[in-house]
Amino acid sequence: MKVLVICAVLFLAIFSNSSAETEDDFLEDESFQADDVIPFLASEQVRSDCTLRNHDCTDDRHSCCRSKMFKDVCKCFYPSQRSETDRAKKELCTCQQPKHLKYIEKGLQKAKDYATG
């Protein structure tokens, strides 16, 4: 049953894509204004108050910066200490990118590079 549903969704996606207007018709449309979008995207900058990757985010755990596609996550851990009392006192948090999101970004970048050139 699951396979049938997946095949039906895939068929509908392919059919709708093939029956849609061609890309040339879309680009000739007057409502398409890519010239207005490109300067906006180029002027977008990284927030100045965000915490960079591998920097301390112990005080503000929601301040991590975004990578190209995904927001980094504040991960906390307890560094190895000699005594048990020192371990309980010191929590260290850093902004990190989860590995699965890192692999997704790399894969999409390689697919984009392959498609463009």
Curated annotation (Swiss-Prot):
Q: Which UniProt keywords apply?
A: Amidation, Cytolysis, Disulfide bond, Knottin, Membrane, Neurotoxin, Secreted, Signal, Target cell membrane, Target membrane, Toxin
At the top level, the lineage of the source is Eukaryota
Q: What cellular component GO annotations does this protein have?
A: extracellular region; membrane; other organism cell membrane
Q: Which residues form the signal peptide?
A: 1-20
Which residues lie in the propeptide?
21-47, 82-87
Q: Name one GO biological process term.
A: killing of cells of another organism
Q: Coiled-coil ranges per the record?
A: none
Please give the PROSITE patterns that the UniProt record associates with this protein.
Answer: SPIDER_CSTX
Matches recorded under InterPro entries = Spider_toxin_CSTX_knottin (IPR019553), Spider_toxin_CSTX_Knottin_CS (IPR011142)
Subunit architecture: Heterodimer of A and B chains; disulfide-linked. Interacts with CSTX-1 (AC P81694), and with CSTX-9 (AC P58604).
Please identify the protein, giving its name as recorded: Toxin CSTX-8
Can you name the source organism?
Cupiennius salei (American wandering spider)
